From Swiss-Prot:
Induction: By ethylene and salicylic acid. This is Glucan endo-1,3-beta-glucosidase, basic vacuolar isoform GLB. One of its GO terms (cellular component) is vacuole. One of its GO terms (molecular function) is glucan endo-1,3-beta-D-glucosidase activity. It comes from Nicotiana tabacum (Common tobacco). Is expressed primarily in epidermal cell of healthy plant, and following induction by ethylene, accumulates in mesophyll cells. Implicated in the defense of plants against pathogens.
């Protein structure tokens, strides 16, 4: 080895180490980017919008769901590079369905006025509208509202940037066991089939709220806690060649099967809500919530037996919201209203915060020895 090679050895080691650290960080962060967090605002003690968006950024949370086009939040999101699922609330669905002029106005005021400074990725038209719940009065308006918003987005020149969909829950699934036999309820097919057709034709994903907690708490005699928390040591459900060790995958794949049976085999799924309450009802404990959330973040990188690969997933919710009811709805937050984390979660960063000082100090130490 030449003299110059000897002198360059520490420097090369530092550069090599820095490169490895950056690659490791990039891999971890890339995996974590499957995860977003829902920003609910039903609390009287929550931080202001600017503080909230700074919290998202500091915790490396790269995706956010808004339930309505709150202009304060949208202003705070400008330049943040956070991808946004923007909600068109149920209260606006009938109005938007009634005419294109209303859809154009909504898109102009809530989308185009903020684009491209705010990275809006989806418009979620309505949340959990269903013919079998208290929102049944809106069912006939949902697909027309989606169509009008889609057309308005296209007219605004954003059709290649923003997908239009709706967020549904599991009440629309008639059969979910085994997952391969998943299907939409027969008495709801008149409602779901047009939605599936719209999503297929526009190449947009279905947004699905998936909560193993509610399945477990409603039927603890047949659904085990480990199966619900991603901690089952063995296969719980054998479905042909597919093996299920957690309820989240089983629920997700039952929706994929339902889509396929409805002519939507090409339609993807984004998990628009999932979480676990830390108090307020049976099974709602701090330990259970921490376990579920930690495992969900990890599992979102991997995919389900039917659809391997990262699952775009939004955790519900950013904060505990004290104006929600019933009691357990107040306890889904990742953070307390004072911005203190309730759990030690990793969004691709150390302890929930990407602490680059570890890499910087390690590199500086090597360079100082040159």
């Amino acid at each position: 080895m030449s003299t110059s090679d000897k002198h360059n050895t520490p420097q090369m080691a530092a550069i090599t180490l820095l490169g490895l650290l950056l690659v490791a960080s990039t891999i971890e962060i890339a995996g974590a980017q499957s995860i977003g967090v829902c920003y609910g605002m039903l609390g009287n003690n929550l931080p202001n919008h600017w503080e909230v968006i700074q919290l998202y950024k500091s915790r490396n949370i790269g995706r956010l769901r808004l339930y309505d086009p709150n202009h304060g939040a949208l202003q705070a999101l400008k330049g943040s590079n956070i991808e946004v699922m923007l909600g068109l609330p149920n209260s606006d669905v009938k109005h938007i369905a009634s005419g294109m002029e209303h859809a154009r106005w909504w898109v102009q005021k809530n989308v185009k006025d903020f684009w491209p400074d705010v990275k809006i990725k989806y418009i979620a038209v309505g949340n959990e509208i269903s013919p079998v719940t208290g929102t049944s009065y809106l069912t006939s308006f949902l697909t027309p509202a989606m169509v009008n918003i889609y057309k308005a987005i296209g007219e605004a020149g954003l059709g290649n940037n923003i997908k239009v969909s709706t967020s549904v829950d599991m009440t629309l699934i008639g059969n979910s066991y085994p997952p391969s036999q998943g299907s939409f309820r027969n008495d709801a097919r008149w409602f779901t089939d047009p939605i599936v057709g719209f999503l297929r034709d526009t190449r947009a994903p279905l947004l699905v709220n998936i909560y193993p907690y509610f399945s477990y708490s409603g039927n603890p005699g047949q659904i085990s806690l480990p199966y619900s928390l991603f901690t089952a040591p063995n296969v719980v459900v054998q479905d042909g060649s597919r093996q299920y060790r957690n309820l989240f995958d089983a629920m997700l794949d039952s929706v994929y099967a339902a889509l396929e049976r409805s002519g939507g085999a090409s339609v993807g799924i984004v998990v628009s809500e999932s979480g676990w309450p830390s108090a307020g009802a049976f099974g709602a404990t701090y330990d259970n919530a921490a376990t579920y959330l930690r495992n969900l973040i990890q599992h979102a990188k991997e995919g389900s037996p039917r659809k391997p690969g990262p699952i775009e997933t939004y955790i519900f919710a950013m904060f505990d919201e004290n104006n929600k009811n019933p009691e357990l709805e107040k306890h889904f937050g990742l953070f307390s209203p004072n911005k203190q984390p309730k759990y030690n979660l990793n969004f691709g960063v150390s302890g929930g915060v990407w602490d680059s000082s570890v890499e910087t100090n390690a590199t500086a130490s090597l360079i100082s020895e040159m």
